[in-house]
Amino acid sequence: MKKRGRKSKKPEEKRAEYDPSSILPLELKIEILMKSPPKSIAKLGFVSNHWSSIIRGQVFTDLYMRRSLAHPRLLFSVYRPNMQMQFFHSCSQEDPSSDHRSVSYTLNSDLRYSFSPPIGGLIFGQNNTKAMIGNPSTGQFVPLPRIKTQRKHIFSIFGYDPVNDLYKVLCMTVRTLRGPHYFRWEDPMWEEPMTEEHQVFTLGPKQKWRMLECKYLHRHHSGSQGICRDGVMYYLASFNDKRSLMSFDLSSEEFNVTKLPEDYILQQFGNMVDHSGKIAIVSQAYSGPMDLWVLEDVSKEEWSKVAAIVPSITDIVGNDQRVIFRGILSTGEIILSLLPTPKPPFFFLCYDPKEKTARKVVIQGIGEDYAAINVFFDHVESHMVLSKLT
């Protein structure tokens, strides 16, 4: 009788036999991962299927995200033209002097990405029809398929759909009778007929840009970034010759329009922020009074006005400096920065409307040869490993 030969073990099974960590209890493994930096966690996910299953598992993912949400970070996108490089720098939002981390990537000589505010630890970058998704915490950046358009004026928003647990990018392109150029509210072209292409990309393997239909003929306000909250994207636009707030539901992929307050004066660069869990628009101001219009009820188109008086900060920035609104932290503090970007070291101003105090926050580690800096607030670290999306 012929003896049946032993089935040879797979390389993965052999590695598991010699992996000392295989005898550790799951709770201890998770504890080790929680104390590891995001880059190390991402690399460990490629060591074995066992570690990968833990890292990608719901238990560890929920624990890691819960901790990240409790400790938000400041994220800076820095451009260095002499080195043809953009890099991200982050630090603790609670104590900007501590826990500094940087990750860089080299660009083509003619390419510089503009980044949308990060969502769930991921960030979207675009340069004309080229686009990418990145995880600044792990240093992984993945190119997306080129945006399908022949037009030059492109506006994109990055968001997360909590209903279906999906990340999506909304892209809009514009054509006007006079050709694309930066808009001004007083420009007559704002009232001329226009057409728009609307495309959406869902993050995942083998995905493509999909064309969408929008029943509202509008043009977005190019002077303001969009914002995503609770699975809905918001951006400023013109609809029926009126300044409006457009919204896009990431789950149903449907557009809607909301009227802006009649007495709201929208300047060239309107800012959209999350104010105490609600969408708000900020009147651009270089100093003095600052008005926030808060959307209290979307269905009823009800807005409330919140006035914030920013005190004189001459002693901090000097007489010849202008300050510009940058955002509102989850704590309610108002962030201001200088125009133009200050010389090294980079700093911004943090104003507490409750205490009526302003302070200068200096950020170390960015270097001295930067040309442009974008600041993102309430950034959360993510250990997510991005799949190939092209």
UniProtKB/Swiss-Prot annotation:
Chain ranges of the F-box domain: 18-67
InterPro entries tied to this protein: F-box-assoc_dom_typ3, F-box-assoc_interact_dom, F-box-like_dom_sf, F-box_dom
Keyword Nucleotide-binding among record annotations: no
Ranges in a coiled coil: none
GO terms for biological process, alphabetical: protein ubiquitination
SMART domains from the UniProt entry: FBOX (SM00256)
Pathway given in the UniProt record: Protein modification; protein ubiquitination
Record-linked Pfam families: F-box, FBA_3
Cellular component GO terms, alphabetical: cytoplasm; nucleus
Key words of the record: Kelch repeat, Nucleus, Repeat, Ubl conjugation pathway
Membrane-spanning ranges: none
Main location: nucleus
Annotated compartments: Nucleus
Kelch repeat locations: 115-161, 272-323
Assembly behavior: Part of a SCF (ASK-cullin-F-box) protein ligase complex. Interacts with SKP1A/ASK1, SKP1B/ASK2, ASK11 and ASK13.
PANTHER family: BNAA05G37150D PROTEIN-RELATED, F-BOX DOMAIN-CONTAINING PROTEIN
Domain notes: The F-box is necessary for the interaction with ASK proteins.
Function per UniProt: Component of SCF(ASK-cullin-F-box) E3 ubiquitin ligase complexes, which may mediate the ubiquitination and subsequent proteasomal degradation of target proteins.
Protein name: F-box/kelch-repeat protein At3g04660
